[in-house]
């Protein structure tokens, strides 16, 4: 029997199933992912990051950010290794993509961009665009488009972290 190399699709499926199983443990009261990063709507940048579950509230938002990056990097690096790709190049590129993406996602979650009219008073603001925190995806997407078009050499160096799966 020939040694069959794993495809990106199969590795993506395995990683997705692994994360799903970890999340599904919550059904039995075992929360192993409550420390994962949550990007909040904010007016004070110090409130932008938190953990997803208040049971982990002793962990700062920045610690959650770093732990989320480390866990994602480790899991995805295993997948990259299974594909026979260069893990070092992937880790470097993924680190840059992760932090750039999270920075711009956080900017999109600013209350002046994200707060709906009924949330303005909660944040002490008198106006907002009202796009909800999903606006962070739009801001991060725009940043990616700008980087790929204005800095093609940088975009090429980050290609190892931008697999479609």
Where are the predicted features?
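N-terminal membrane topogenic signal
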Residues: 1-14, 61-62, 89-90
